[in-house]
From Swiss-Prot:
Role summary: Provides the (R)-glutamate required for cell wall biosynthesis.
Residue ranges that the Swiss-Prot or TrEMBL entry lists as coiled coil: none
GO terms under biological process: cell wall organization; peptidoglycan biosynthetic process; regulation of cell shape
SUPFAM superfamilies to which the protein is assigned, alphabetical: Aspartate/glutamate racemase
Positions annotated as active site in the UniProt record: 72, 183
Family affiliation: Belongs to the aspartate/glutamate racemases family.
PROSITE patterns cross-referenced by the UniProt entry: ASP_GLU_RACEMASE_1 (PS00923), ASP_GLU_RACEMASE_2 (PS00924)
Name listed for the protein in its UniProt record: Glutamate racemase
Keywords on record: Cell shape, Cell wall biogenesis/degradation, Isomerase, Peptidoglycan synthesis
Length: 265
């Protein structure tokens, strides 16, 4: 089935998920919406995030997608269940698979969750992790400066390194062996985060885990694209297309992308 996979995010963070899907499923077409004009979602109310997420989902429904990936942890926490109940296609989030991978990986059962304020407040990762192993000790840390840093495109260099180190300072005296990047923007900063937490700590990207979920769901439903299908990805941003283009083309390494401005309502 050569219909596109829909991917939505508060901004450019979901491109980390899109990249892993493209790598894992090279024949699939992705239609991506990044709500860059209203990013970040972390400080917003649950109702705002739910409304914005539904607007993106409805826009992609009109484009005849075969599956929707909510590539935003904050949006997954507040809108996944309602979308799964009401959409005519499978809807996946980014929290459960990341939690499963972390529980499998940790040896000491000491897990740090780096995420937005909204995701931390929702308790979604705590719920997912404890449902898998009640002995897991969870250290949640909101990193409100990280998403704006990525969205600005200025996430390389000493200023960015200093900002990341400052954001992770509360972990200095904590004991842990696993870190979940509980925001899809954060894998763009993964190398810098790894440099701060140290080489003995496993840093887990929910993007890679979510791409595995996508493949499994499509295979189960018999809706994988034909092996000779040529992808025709489309990207939509609610904010600046030039800034989105710069980040997307640099991150995805797919050449010149088909990117458009979109108005959601």
């Amino acid at each position: 089935m050569n219909a596109p996979i829909g991917v939505i995010d508060s901004g450019v963070g979901g491109l980390t998920v899109a990249k892993e899907i493209i790598k894992r499923l090279p024949n699939e077409t992705i239609y991506y919406i990044g709500d860059t004009a209203r990013c970040p979602y972390g400080p917003r109310t649950r109702q705002e995030v739910r409304n914005f997420t539904w607007q993106m989902a409805k826009a992609l429904e009109k484009m005849n997608i075969k599956m929707l990936v909510i590539a935003c942890n904050t949006a997954t926490a507040v809108a996944l269940e309602s979308l799964q109940r009401n959409m005519p296609f499978p809807v996946l989030g980014v929290i459960n698979r990341g939690a499963r991978a972390a529980v499998k990986k940790t040896k000491r059962h000491e897990v740090v969750v780096l995420a937005t304020e909204g995701t931390i407040k929702s308790g979604a990762y705590e719920e997912a992790l404890l449902s898998l192993n009640t002995s897991t000790h969870i250290i949640p840390l909101a990193c409100p400066t990280f998403v704006p840093l990525v969205e600005s495109g200025e996430y390389k260099g000493q200023f960015a390194n200093n900002l990341i180190a400052e954001g992770l300072k509360p972990l200095k005296n904590e004991q842990f062996d696993t870190v979940i990047l509980g925001c899809t923007h954060y894998p763009i900063l993964q190398k810098q985060i790894e440099a701060v937490v140290g080489e003995d700590v496993f840093v887990l990207s929910s993007a890679e885990e979510t791409a595995k979920d996508v493949e499994e769901m499509l295979a189960y439903n018999g809706t994988l694209a034909d092996t000779n299908a040529k992808p025709a990805h489309k990207f939509y941003a609610t904010g600046s297309v030039p800034i989105f283009r710069s980040i997307a083309e640099n991150w995805l390494e797919q050449g010149t992308l088909d990117i458009h401005r979109i108005t959601l309502k």
